């Protein structure tokens, strides 16, 4: 649909809004075959829930299904789609997301709605004075959307569980590959990083049919960076 074919210049000028995520520099995170969509965009979200509903209606009646396994993040939805070389903290500064944040929290950034420089200014404010509110809000929105998905797969006779796997992109340097990292840094890194990626572990207790699953790729390598980053151990 050409309505959603928007260039970075239009996004930066404020003359059009993208259905893709936008980073701190005002660039859309568009990947292979249009990946990089913003799950907070209504059109994108409706497409997700409609597809999930179709899957559930097709397979719900066969029984014996434990639940639905979904990967969140990197290029998969719902999540903050993160291209290689970037982290979740750098993603999510589009006009729609910022307007929703301001509306939900009552916090006003008081920045212009046009011009490329507004994205870097948003990043500075939301990772500075409004850090706690920003990342708490992102985790709440992710939780709300996850609950909506869970409701879809419980709408029939057979109630499926939802298993959510955050696929977050780690920075090149972190406490599990820095020789001077402290035990405290390693003990808190995973939880802090999940919060920044919109998956605050405190919002998931596994008792309501929604389970946050630890990231377990690269586990067989058992190197200090890989093993530590996926288990929050190594101290």
Regions found by a protein language model. Give the residues of each.
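A Trp-anchored, charged/polar loop motif used as the substrate-binding/catalytic surface
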Residues: 42-57, 143-147, 188-196
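Active-site regions of oxyanion-processing enzymes, predominantly non-cytosolic
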Residues: 65-71
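Substrate-binding cleft/loops of secretory-pathway carbohydrate-active enzymes
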Residues: 74-80, 149-234
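Aromatic- and carboxylate-enriched substrate-binding clefts and catalytic-loop regions
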Residues: 1-9, 32-33, 71-114
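Acidic, His- and aromatic-enriched active-site or binding-groove loops in soluble protein domains
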Residues: 11-30, 90-109, 181-204
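Active-site-adjacent "subsite" loops/lids of carbohydrate-active enzymes
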Residues: 1-60, 112-135
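Active-site neighborhood of glycoside hydrolase catalytic domains
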Residues: 50-51, 63, 90-162
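Short loop/turn motifs at secondary-structure junctions
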Residues: 59-65, 206
């Amino acid at each position: 649909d050409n309505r959603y074919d928007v260039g970075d210049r239009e996004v930066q000028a404020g003359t059009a809004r993208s259905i893709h995520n936008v980073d701190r520099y005002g660039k859309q995170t568009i990947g292979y075959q249009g990946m990089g969509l913003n799950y907070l965009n209504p059109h994108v979200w409706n497409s997700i829930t409609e597809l999930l509903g179709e899957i559930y209606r097709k397979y719900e009646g066969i029984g014996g299904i434990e639940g639905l396994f979904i990967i969140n993040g990197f290029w998969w939805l719902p999540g903050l789609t993160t291209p290689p070389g970037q982290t979740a903290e750098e993603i999510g500064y589009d006009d729609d997301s910022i307007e929703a944040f301001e509306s939900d929290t009552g916090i006003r950034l008081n920045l212009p709605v046009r011009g490329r420089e507004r994205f870097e200014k948003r990043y500075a404010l939301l990772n500075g004075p409004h850090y706690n509110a920003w990342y708490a809000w992102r985790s709440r929105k992710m939780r709300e959307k996850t609950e909506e998905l869970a409701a879809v797969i419980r709408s029939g006779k057979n109630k499926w569980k939802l298993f959510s796997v955050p696929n977050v992109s780690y920075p090149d340097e972190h406490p599990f590959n820095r020789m001077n990292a402290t035990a405290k840094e390693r003990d808190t890194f995973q939880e802090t990083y999940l919060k920044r990626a919109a998956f605050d572990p405190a919002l998931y207790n596994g008792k309501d049919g929604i389970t946050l699953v630890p990231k377990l790729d690269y586990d067989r390598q058992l190197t200090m960076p890989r093993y530590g980053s996926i288990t929050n151990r190594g101290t």
